[in-house]
Amino acid sequence: MGKDSSDVTLVKNSDNIVATWSVDGLTFTQTVTLANTKSALHGMASISYGVKSTDGRSADSVQARVMLDTALGYQDYAVYELTKKDSTYEQIQSETVIDNSDGEAYNNALFGYDNPKAPSVTAYTVNASINNKIVAPYQIAFGHWNNLASSVFDFEPDNSLTFTNPYNEKYLTADSAYALYFDMGSVAANGEGDT
């Protein structure tokens, strides 16, 4: 991670799981909460992040990458559909990075499904709002799990790699993941931020 980092600590509460770790004077907190434990629609979770300066120094630009591994039943990959601001969809099956720094490439939701011709399993990602402000990533990376997981933050896609192809030459497996990149802004000395 950084020059000065800690191991991740986990705390399981009655309604969430909290992971905490530190890097270079910043303490990060990830909270995963089931969205509605009484719902028949199991598996909907809320993921939030917080950062706090713990060494008396400020941080000008804190960014976070959230990598999510997609498994749909026994299938370890998804065909992704990115919702766009103009109400169209972009199907993604090859490694790519989408620049959303202007907020125009992504309309706060994406989904993946097992079969583009006859979907039977679907997974969704919807960005929430904090204090009436939509929290959207400035960048989204889609890739083969092996390639995306081997990068810590920056990701160089192999645009010729189709991650839904079990016979791709690089990994000989179909496997996908995606990463959402968030700008958490600046953090004042001993201050906090969240996403």
Predicted regions and their residues:
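Acidic-aromatic substrate-binding/catalytic surfaces of carbohydrate-active enzymes
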Residues: 1-9
